[in-house]
Design a protein with these regions (language model features):
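Active-site loop-to-helix "anion-binding N-cap" substructures in soluble metabolic enzymes
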Residues: 2-276, 281-349
Length: 349
């Protein structure tokens, strides 16, 4: 592989662009986004952005990946729902999904004619890996009258066995709107518990049965840490994801999807924020709201952190077979019906 050459002026301009965007980021222990770091990023981001044009590619970046990917080469950044919409709308020949494998599968489900690649095939998900399509079929035999709702953090074969997909931003409204009383919710047990609590609060009568998966990032937070943070930082706002435990969600000032958390912080005046989510989101907030103060407490997703500029470049330049997402067409169509049902039922902004 021959590295492309860029002029000193091109490299300096790219370094300045990156440093201006990333100078406030401080979200991953042991990493820096100072000027020297941006000098190291610049040849890669220039090469990737050149390759995107040559390959007719679009790069989708989840908010949990590192800032140099999001702001250096990403075409769209956001949560699972937003990025699934962008995949559905894409006309590009290639989609590079800087996230985890189930997200790239979702992009392939929604954009079947595109070549969809994932930078690291090892980027799994504790939720998505907790149940298979066979597991869902077994549960359906136990609860034949249940409507099967799958969280978007699930594999393509699980989506193919489900009636409707949901995200953390639309789960409450979609489940509340379903005519069935009995809901089989996979794979997130803690989100199911939060849905149960929210629907009870709304006066909606549903029996929610769940599988036993949890997110290794969000199930790690606890109310004792929240109480300690409130004692140390008067006026603190606590922001949590619905993948947290119901106890943590109840102790928070705001609970919502990644995108909703971003909006809440941007629109809320407070001296401090505690973000009970993945540290990548804190990185985005540090970049986009440098005037806000974040006190730490976030957690790292080891799967999201497998993404790197080098791997994005390699996936664009000459993707290996393991980086290319392939799906059986019958399975893809069944999974697409599940996701399309979500788009039909999701509240319109």
């Amino acid at each position: 592989m021959i590295a492309p050459s860029f002029t000193p002026a091109e490299l300096e301009a790219e370094t300045e662009r990156l440093f201006k965007a990333l100078m406030h980021a401080d979200c991953t222990p042991g990493r820096s986004w100072n000027y020297q770091a941006c000098q190291g990023f610049a040849p890669l981001t220039l090469e990737i952005n050149r390759l995107k044009k040559e390959k007719d590619a679009v790069i989708l970046t989840h908010s949990y990946v590192e800032p140099e990917i999001i702001y250096g080469v990403g075409d769209f950044k956001g949560d699972s729902y937003f990025l699934s919409l962008k995949a559905r709308e894409s006309k590009a020949k290639m989609i590079v999904f800087a996230g985890v494998v189930f997200m790239a599968e979702t992009a392939k489900i929604l954009s079947p004619d595109a070549t969809v690649v994932v930078p690291d095939r090892g980027s799994g998900c504790s939720l998505a890996d907790s149940i298979t399509g066979d597991g869902v079929r077994s549960l359906k035999k136990l609860y034949p009258d249940a409507t099967v709702v799958c969280y978007i953090n699930s594999t393509a074969d699980v989506k193919a066995e489900s009636d409707v997909c949901v995200t953390s931003g639309n789960v409450y409204d979609i489940v509340a709107s379903l005519p069935a009383r009995r809901i089989l919710f996979v794979p997130d047990r803690l989100m199911a518990e939060n849905v149960r609590a929210e629907l009870k609060h709304r006066g909606v009568d549903k029996e929610i049965i769940s599988s036993d998966g949890t997110c290794i990032v969000h199930d790690d937070f606890n109310v004792a840490a929240v109480a300690d943070a409130r004692a140390r930082f008067p006026g603190l706002k606590v922001v949590a994801h619905p993948e947290c435990t119901p106890e943590v969600a109840a102790a928070a000032d705001f609970v919502g999807s990644t995108g909703a958390m971003m909006k809440y912080v941007k629109n809320t005046a407070a001296p401090y924020f505690l973000m009970l989510t993945e540290c990548g989101l804190v990185g985005r907030l540090q970049v986009e709201t440098p005037e806000k103060n974040f006190i730490g407490g976030c957690r790292l997703c080891p799967y999201m952190k497998l993404n790197s500029l080098e791997k994005v470049r390699d996936a664009l330049l000459a993707p290996r077979p393991d980086q290319i997402v392939t799906l059986d067409e019958n399975l893809r169509q069944r999974a697409a019906r599940c996701i399309d049902r979500m788009f039909e039922l999701a509240p319109k902004d």
